């Protein structure tokens, strides 16, 4: 069993013991028990409010293991628009609903929701249901990383 207690600065020269695949929602948990695909138990015991991102490195309480966090593929809706203005309008409306959204210059990505899908389609966006890593914005008041 591993207990992960601190976020460390990424270093490409360190040996990673394990990669832990977590959904966007799971990456918001600072204290939780996870089980890896091979059955290994991993506990997160991080400072309250810690938000993990794809590529973050965590260290266990013995300082002997480094674990990389990876965004786990999960069901998402990807929205694309004919114009950037339409995409910005859609981002505005999703933000008004406090919906976690991954924002890029060419698409918006959100968790599946039939009401939001219908709203976006009525606005003229093309929606595709996919299974991909989801990396929503942390928000203006989100956790700040040292990297």
UniProtKB/Swiss-Prot annotation:
The keyword Chaperone applies. Keywords: Chaperone, Cytoplasm, Nickel, Nickel insertion. InterPro entries: UreE, UreE_C_dom, UreE_N, UreE_N_sf. It is found in: Cytoplasm. It comes from the Bacteria. Gene3D superfamilies: Urease metallochaperone UreE, N-terminal domain, UreE, C-terminal domain. The keyword Cytoplasm applies. GO terms for cellular component: cytoplasm. Pfam families: UreE_C (PF05194), UreE_N (PF02814). Signal peptide: none annotated. Belongs to the UreE family. NCBIfam families: PRK13261.1-1. Involved in urease metallocenter assembly. Binds nickel. Probably functions as a nickel donor during metallocenter assembly. This is Urease accessory protein UreE. It comes from Nostoc sp. (strain PCC 7120 / SAG 25.82 / UTEX 2576).
């Amino acid at each position: 069993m591993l207990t992960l207690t601190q976020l460390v600065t990424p270093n490409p020269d360190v040996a990673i013991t394990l990669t832990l695949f977590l959904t966007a929602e799971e990456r918001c948990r600072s204290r939780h028990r996870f089980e890896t695909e091979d059955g290994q138990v991993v506990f997160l015991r991080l400072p309250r409010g810690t938000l993990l991102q794809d590529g973050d490195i965590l260290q266990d309480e013995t300082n002997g293991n480094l674990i990389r966090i990876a965004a786990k593929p999960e069901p998402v809706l990807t929205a694309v628009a004919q114009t950037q203005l339409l995409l910005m309008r859609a981002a505005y409306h999703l933000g008004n609903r406090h919906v976690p959204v991954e924002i890029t210059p060419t698409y918006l990505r959100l968790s599946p929701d039939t009401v939001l899908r219908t709203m976006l389609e009525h606005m003229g966006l093309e929606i595709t249901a996919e299974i991909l890593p989801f990396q929503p914005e942390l928000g203006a008041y989100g956790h700040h990383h040292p990297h």
